[in-house]
Amino acid sequence: MEIIKSILYFILAGIFEIGGGYLIWIWLRDGKSYLYGVIGAVILILYGIIPTLQPSNADFGKVYAAYGGIFIVMSILWGWKIDNIVPDKFDLIGGCIALVGVIVIMYAPRG
């Protein structure tokens, strides 16, 4: 159950980081209202809180290193579903490699 909860926190953090960053991106790059930037900034602050909900035995470095792998995969998915940029085989291979890293860093048994 802890692993499922941990993965859900990673996914939630990814949605907040990518979503908040995207709102700031379209504010500055696409000329949207400054409110997009404000909302994006608030979402990014919330993103910073979510990783603290990870299990207490996971230190900052491990959580953020593993989150990097999740971020890679979620960014590829965001580009595909939101910006209609279809990932190629190298994107998919790289995403799978990143997920293997997440599993090793966060969930490999240590003794």
UniProtKB/Swiss-Prot annotation:
The keyword rRNA-binding does not apply. Keywords: Cell membrane, Membrane, Transmembrane, Transmembrane helix. The chain crosses the membrane at residues 7-27, 33-53, 60-80, 85-105. The keyword Transmembrane applies. It is a multi-pass membrane protein. Its main location: membrane. It is found in: Cell membrane. Pfam families: UPF0060. GO terms for cellular component: plasma membrane. SUPFAM superfamilies: Multidrug resistance efflux transporter EmrE. PANTHER family: UPF0060 MEMBRANE PROTEIN YNFA. Belongs to the UPF0060 family. This is UPF0060 membrane protein Cbei_2176. It comes from Clostridium beijerinckii (strain ATCC 51743 / NCIMB 8052) (Clostridium acetobutylicum). The lineage of its organism: Bacteria, Bacillati, Bacillota, Clostridia, Eubacteriales.
